[in-house]
Amino acid sequence: QIDNGNLGDALYYTKQENSNFGLRLRMLVRTIDELDYIPPMPVSLDLKEVRWEEWKVLFKQIVEDSVYEVILLDIGESVQGLLKMLDLCDRIYMPVLEDDVSQEKLRQYEENLQRLQLERLMEKTYMFIGLQDIENKMRQLVKEEVL
């Protein structure tokens, strides 16, 4: 498939005046089954350099200047402004493995939210324990959100 760009390009377009963001976004988007997505940045270190303010502008432009009403994020803790990003979300879907390390990470997440008085994030977090059929569950949840 032709490389039409990635998430880094989408972030770049948000900084351009008169960039016709919606049209440029359509050129970046790829589709798997019925799910449109923007390919990730090729170097994960670049992702760590993106400031929270840049993410916020990107999300705002996607919602305001494109056909998309739902944004599904696949993010980790290395993203700047992670908790602010999660606070913008209506729902947080979190797959959790059953091993001890994963359970400890979940416990830390919950404790950090309590410490920071962000229990509201926990209230909108839906967890999936184990990997059995997680892909189908996620697809179903996304379809329900769109309807």
Residue ranges with predicted function:
Residues 20-29, 39-73:
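Cytosolic-facing regulatory segments adjacent to core modules
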Residues 2-6, 35-39, 56-61, 92-94:
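Generic detector of short, locally flexible boundary/turn motifs and exposed helical patches
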Residues 57-146:
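Conserved catalytic-core segment of NTP-binding enzymes
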Residues 1-37:
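Phosphate-binding loop that captures ATP/GTP phosphates
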